[in-house]
Swiss-Prot record:
Keywords for the protein's UniProt record, in alphabetical order: ATP synthesis, Cell inner membrane, Cell membrane, CF(0), Hydrogen ion transport, Ion transport, Membrane, Transmembrane, Transmembrane helix, Transport
Species of provenance: Pseudomonas putida (strain GB-1)
Any one GO molecular function term: proton-transporting ATP synthase activity, rotational mechanism
Record's protein name: ATP synthase subunit b
Transmembrane segments: 12-32
Function text: F(1)F(0) ATP synthase produces ATP from ADP in the presence of a proton or sodium gradient. F-type ATPases consist of two structural domains, F(1) containing the extramembraneous catalytic core and F(0) containing the membrane proton channel, linked together by a central stalk and a peripheral stalk. During catalysis, ATP synthesis in the catalytic domain of F(1) is coupled via a rotary mechanism of the central stalk subunits to proton translocation.
Cellular component, GO annotation: plasma membrane; proton-transporting ATP synthase complex
Subcellular localization, as worded in the UniProt entry: Cell inner membrane
Length: 156
């Protein structure tokens, strides 16, 4: 291999070219590569954060949905209990009213029965006096024998 001036000149030119590239071309290229690398890394980080945020939002939405369902179920259960309570209260009121009406009817029946017994006693007494008049053939004084009729009616 022959080393001559051309090879030395080419080596010097190449060295100057490399130094020139290292001084003026390489820093902007490195800077551009670093900026691009940073943008890509930031984009990936943003995508990861967005994915995590989406996952958290979905989890939170699911939790809120479960809570809403639980609240709805609780409200429905409370409504059912309240409805059952209202039905039971209505039944109790109906029973009380029925008992009151029944007691009132029994009292009226008892009163009518007593009135009928008193009327029957009076009629029996009048019939007894009428029968006694017919048997004795004479008129019995109603005022004089009222006590006798009352005793007879009380015995019947």
């Amino acid at each position: 291999m022959n080393i001559n001036a051309t090879l030395i000149g080419q080596s010097v030119a190449f060295l100057i070219f490399v130094l020139f590239c290292m001084k003026y071309v390489w820093p902007p290229v490195i800077t551009a590569l670093q900026e691009r690398q940073k943008k890509i890394a930031d984009g990936l980080d943003a995508a990861n954060r967005a994915a995590r945020d989406l996952e958290l939002a979905q989890e939170k939405a699911g939790q809120q949905l479960r809570e809403a369902k639980a609240q709805a179920a609780e409200i429905i259960e409370q409504s059912k209990k309240r409805a059952a309570q209202l039905v039971e209260e209505a039944r109790d009121q109906a029973r009380v009213e029925a008992d009151r009406v029944k007691a009132q009817a029994l009292a009226e029946i008892e009163q009518e029965l007593n009135s009928a017994k008193d009327a029957l006693r009076a009629q029996v007494g009048a019939l007894a006096v009428g029968g006694a008049e017919k048997i004795l053939g004479a008129t019995i004084d109603q005022n004089a024998h009222a006590e006798l009729v009352n005793k007879l009616a009380a015995e019947i």
